[in-house]
């Protein structure tokens, strides 16, 4: 192994830590169905409207899966690059449904934060299986928390911007579709 550091999302990371992050990401990808089920349950617990019917629940679950797989796959590559900057289409699908149904956008924030918390808790459990307590585990958790939280912040920003655009289009269409009253 060469003695240099990777730049992951602007963070200098030693190769040994990049490898450990990849090992934990691999474990989580191997258990992705369980992770997504936990994320889904946590989101519905805090925002029951996201499980109100099969259609929105399926979209929410697809979004959770797409975001988790995207981030974990990027970490598992062990190449020092973060997750892609674009938002998974599944994440945009569910936010459009939220807007079209007139659901408060705060649900999106709650859902992402709850999903992030579940993923982070699972990551810590797997990390403790891969690395003994000590400085290496601390470095692994510090790097991963920065990468994970930055990814979620970035996705939330883009998803909310898309939601606001969608809402403006819907409101504009409704406003233009209403006949004007004469004075």
Protein language model features and the residues they cover:
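Hydrophobic, helix-rich cores of sensory/ligand-binding and other regulatory modules
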Residues: 2-183
């Amino acid at each position: 192994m060469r003695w240099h550091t990777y730049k992951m999302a602007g963070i200098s990371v030693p190769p040994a830590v990049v490898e450990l992050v990849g090992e934990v990401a691999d474990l989580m990808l191997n258990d992705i169905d369980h992770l997504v089920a936990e994320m889904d349950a946590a989101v519905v617990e805090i925002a029951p409207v996201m499980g109100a019917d099969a259609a929105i629940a399926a979209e929410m679950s697809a979004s959770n899966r797409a975001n988790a797989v995207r981030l974990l796959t990027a970490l598992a590559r062990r190449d020092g690059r973060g997750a892609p900057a674009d938002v998974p289409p599944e994440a945009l699908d569910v936010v459009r449904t939220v807007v079209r149904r007139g659901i408060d956008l705060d649900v999106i924030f709650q859902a992402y934060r709850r999903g992030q918390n579940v993923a982070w808790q699972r990551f810590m459990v797997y990390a403790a299986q891969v690395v003994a307590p000590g400085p290496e585990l601390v470095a692994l958790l510090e790097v991963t928390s920065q990468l994970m939280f930055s990814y979620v912040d970035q996705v939330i920003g883009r998803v909310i911007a898309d939601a606001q655009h969608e809402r403006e289009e819907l409101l504009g269409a409704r406003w233009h579709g209403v006949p004007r009253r004469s004075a």
